[in-house]
């Protein structure tokens, strides 16, 4: 987690520096050294995982207000008074990790963590915090409140999962009799009205003709996801043959999605384990019978999930890394 601290007094700056020594991050003093709060907040909101204000909560609230978008995208925001008495998570308590960060910071300076989320206050299962701990994206953040609301009202909720979840489900959480009856689902193929939690375990294998533009790749990718009902939030990186390393369109496409790329030689691709769609034409051009499937499997160190799909000179495939979800969702669980 990349942290950014800002303080407004000498005492607050000393506390920020103490906190940064334990939870590393940059430290700035508002109003000094040319640091303007509005500029600092805008920059850090875009590039940091967490913003820590040492000062009045009102200052922090006014500073972040223009930048808040959604609980799925906003960074964690925590405020501490300059005396280090209280640590208050203001934004992204679960998905952004602000609640946990506030507790860590409080432990450093012996402050009281002031956690205001209802599920935490009552010890109720927090589906969004569980999603974060299982490295899942939340496809529909607006649906979190229905799951949490039911649990807070003393009702049970049902889940479906495409993987076995080890351990015992929390109180009030039961397996659904059928997938379409689930209140939340752990899946890469979201359907229906449930809250879908998307494991971030997928690798996109890519093959393309020389000179393929980012726009063409984007169009193909959208069609690929639509045809397979696949959740793009599950992809964490992309992979291809080293012949494509200098393709500007491919680089721009991956950059737009925030994916790093892995490139493999033909010899390395031939070592991939599994059954793959073979093409004599691809073999004659690249030296290996399949690029997208083999590259995805190698990068994921896993298994093929969606086989080769082709359109307009673009081939795509998806492989999955190993995934072993469990029911742990709190810091104090073993």
Predicted regions and their residues:
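C-terminal non-catalytic interaction/assembly regions of soluble proteins
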Residues: 241-294, 300-304, 311-314
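Conserved beta-strand termini and adjacent loop/short-helix elements that scaffold enzyme active sites
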Residues: 29-32, 116-118, 264-266, 307
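Conserved mixed alpha/beta catalytic, RNA-binding, or beta-rich assembly cores of soluble enzyme
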Residues: 8, 12-18, 25, 34-36, ...
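Extreme N-terminal starter segment of soluble prokaryotic enzymes
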Residues: 1-5
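Structural signal for terminal/edge beta-strands and the immediately following C-terminal loop/tail
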Residues: 297-334
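Donor nucleotide-activated moiety binding/catalytic core segment of transferases
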Residues: 41
């Amino acid at each position: 987690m990349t942290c950014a601290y800002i303080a407004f007094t000498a005492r607050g700056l000393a506390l920020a520096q103490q906190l940064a020594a334990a939870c590393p991050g940059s430290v700035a003093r508002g109003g000094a050294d040319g640091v303007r709060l509005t500029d600092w907040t805008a920059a850090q909101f875009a590039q940091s995982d967490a913003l820590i204000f040492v000062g009045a909560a009102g200052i922090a609230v006014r500073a972040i207000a223009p930048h808040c978008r959604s609980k799925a995208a906003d960074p964690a925001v925590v405020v501490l008074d300059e005396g280090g008495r209280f640590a208050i998570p203001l934004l992204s308590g679960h998905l952004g990790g602000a609640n946990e960060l506030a507790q860590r910071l409080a432990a450093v300076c012996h402050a009281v963590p002031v956690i205001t989320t209802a599920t935490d206050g009552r010890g109720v299962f927090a589906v969004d915090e569980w999603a974060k701990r299982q490295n899942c994206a939340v496809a529909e953040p607006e649906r979190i409140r229905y799951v949490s609301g039911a649990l807070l009202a003393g009702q049970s909720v049902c889940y479906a999962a495409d993987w076995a979840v080890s351990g015992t489900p929390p109180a009030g959480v039961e397996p659904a009799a059928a997938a379409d009856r689930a209140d939340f689902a752990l899946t890469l193929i979201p359907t229906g009205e449930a809250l879908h939690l998307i494991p971030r375990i997928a690798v996109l294998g890519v093959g393309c003709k020389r000179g393929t533009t980012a726009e063409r790749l984007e169009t193909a990718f959208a069609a690929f996801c639509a045809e397979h009902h696949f959740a793009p939030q599950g992809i964490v990186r992309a992979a291809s043959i080293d012949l494509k390393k200098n393709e500007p369109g491919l680089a721009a496409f991956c950059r737009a999605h925030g994916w790093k790329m892995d490139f493999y030689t033909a010899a390395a691709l031939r070592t991939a384990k599994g059954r793959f769609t073979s093409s004599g034409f691809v073999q004659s051009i690249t030296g290996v019978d399949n690029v997208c499937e083999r590259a995805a499997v190698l990068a994921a160190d896993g298994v093929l999930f969606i086989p080769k799909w082709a359109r307009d000179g673009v081939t795509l495939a998806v492989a999955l890394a190993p995934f072993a979800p469990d029911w742990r969702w709190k810091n104090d669980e073993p």
